[in-house]
Curated annotation (Swiss-Prot):
<dbReference type="InterPro" id="IPR018480">
    <property type="entry name" value="PNAcMuramoyl-5peptid_Trfase_CS"/>
</dbReference>
<keyword id="KW-0132">Cell division</keyword>
<keyword id="KW-0808">Transferase</keyword>
<dbReference type="GO" id="GO:0005886">
    <property type="term" value="C:plasma membrane"/>
</dbReference>
<feature type="transmembrane region" description="Helical">
    <location>
        <begin position="193"/>
        <end position="213"/>
    </location>
</feature>
<feature type="transmembrane region" description="Helical">
    <location>
        <begin position="225"/>
        <end position="245"/>
    </location>
</feature>
<feature type="transmembrane region" description="Helical">
    <location>
        <begin position="76"/>
        <end position="96"/>
    </location>
</feature>
<dbReference type="GO" id="GO:0071555">
    <property type="term" value="P:cell wall organization"/>
</dbReference>
<feature type="transmembrane region" description="Helical">
    <location>
        <begin position="28"/>
        <end position="48"/>
    </location>
</feature>
<dbReference type="InterPro" id="IPR000715">
    <property type="entry name" value="Glycosyl_transferase_4"/>
</dbReference>
<keyword id="KW-0460">Magnesium</keyword>
<keyword id="KW-0472">Membrane</keyword>
<comment type="pathway">
    <text>Cell wall biogenesis; peptidoglycan biosynthesis.</text>
</comment>
<feature type="transmembrane region" description="Helical">
    <location>
        <begin position="289"/>
        <end position="309"/>
    </location>
</feature>
<feature type="transmembrane region" description="Helical">
    <location>
        <begin position="100"/>
        <end position="120"/>
    </location>
</feature>
<keyword id="KW-1133">Transmembrane helix</keyword>
<dbReference type="Pfam" id="PF10555">
    <property type="entry name" value="MraY_sig1"/>
</dbReference>
Length: 392
């Protein structure tokens, strides 16, 4: 918005040359981060008071850790604050004509809406289950598949009209069309190795990345500050990849696919980092507010969508290794418990408790130890992911 305003002012008043600074992506990214940070810090106390007045408190389940019982009643649905800061900051600082930022914003809001309904049912309607699993996955699938169908052609073309034309040609040709190499699965640490996916392969991969990332972040969000800091670190790292793939110079030099327009995603990533740090101010132990599903599902989906656009799905799995392991721990625990119950008549556990962060608490780690150690691991994994920029 401000970029368009600056460009318009320059056309009517050429002497306002200093407004050219708005054309620099790095400047706007810095401003987006600062704007989101300030919005989060200033609006945070009001949002928390409002949540308390509405009695939107986090219910603690009976089988939860004993040390967590004191958290009962802590305001939840604080993810609204994160989404508010991201939305306002991004709209102020990004190029409004950029379709990639719009699709990430819409996916984020879509998954945020799903999480909002889930949280509302839990804390307001007093339904301990919230949205039923099938219902939740249905709506996640709807949003994820719509995004995947748009992105499969959007990455190939720089015009929305051409995207629509490609989609219609795909339908008329019997759902068979070749995608350019840059739409393939990029293998990290390998020089210019990209496995072709085809339309169906791309759509399936995109769906799995977006929905999987969303639920993985949601499963990780179980301790004060545990999920938000890794989201900030992974999101910031993806912003670097967006900057590279959006630049014809850097992408050519680093042997990355050039995806025109993807650089603007740096604005969204910066806003996500700023809003995340602001939220951490209130979410650090002992937390004054929890993000809830409205925040966790939305942020996870945003990370997945950005990774797909910049063709870094595997790198996302590396940098977000904590999210991956947390999700796997739940799947393994459930699968093993059902298998042993069917075979031996009594269910057995692989972990003392799942997700994995609760297992470490059961092993004697304090909550703050688990959180900070997971942060350190994420920081190291992000460095590994960023090293793929050059180590190829």
């Amino acid at each position: 918005m401000l970029l368009s305003l600056a460009q318009w002012l320059q056309t009517i008043s050429p002497e306002l040359g200093f407004l050219r600074v708005f054309q620099y992506l790095t400047f706007r990214a810095l401003m987006a981060a600062m704007t989101a940070l300030l919005i989060g810090l200033l609006a945070g106390p009001f949002v928390i008071r409002r949540l308390i007045s509405l009695k939107i408190g986090q219910p603690i389940r009976e089988y939860a850790m004993q040390t967590h019982l004191s958290k009962s009643g802590t305001p939840t649905m604080g993810g609204v604050l994160i989404l508010l800061a991201i939305g306002i900051s991004t709209l102020l600082w990004f190029d409004l004509s950029n379709r990639f930022v719009w699709i990430v914003l819409l996916v984020t809001l879509g998954f945020g809406a799903i999480g909002w309904v889930d949280d509302w049912r839990k804390v307001v309607l007093k339904d301990p289950e919230g949205m039923r699993s099938r219902e939740k996955y249905l709506w996640q699938s709807v949003v994820g598949l719509i995004a995947a169908l748009y992105l499969v052609f959007s990455i190939s073309e720089s015009s929305n009209l051409r995207v629509l034309e490609l989609f219609m040609n795909w339908v008329r040709s019997g759902l068979d069309v070749n995608l350019p190499p840059k739409a393939g699965l990029l293998v990290p640490f390998m020089k210019e190795i990209s496995y072709p996916l085809g339309v169906f392969g791309f759509v399936i991969l995109t769906y799995l990345v977006i929905v999987g990332s969303s639920n993985a972040v949601n499963l990780t969000d179980g301790l004060d500050g545990l999920a938000i800091m890794p989201v900030v670190m992974v999101g910031s790292s993806l912003g670097v990849f967006a900057y590279v793939t959006g630049s014809s110079v850097y992408s050519k030099y680093l042997l990355f696919p050039h995806i025109p327009g993807s650089g603007e995603l740096l604005i969204f990533c910066a806003a996500m980092a700023g809003s995340g740090l602001a939220f951490l101010w209130f979410n650090t132990h002992p937390a004054q507010v929890f993000m809830g599903d409205v925040g966790a599902l939305a942020l996870g989906a945003a990370l997945g969508t950005i990774a797909v656009i910049v063709r870094q799905e595997i790198v996302l799995a590396i940098m977000g290794g904590i999210f991956v392991v947390e999700a796997l721990s739940v799947m393994l625990q459930v699968t093993w418990f059902k298998y042993t119950k069917r075979r031996y008549g009594q269910g057995r556990r692989l972990f003392q408790m799942a997700p994995l962060h609760h297992h470490f608490e059961k092993c004697g780690w304090k909550e703050t130890q688990v959180v900070v150690r997971f942060w350190i691991i994420t920081m190291l994994l992000c460095l590994v992911g960023l090293s793929t920029l050059k180590l190829r």
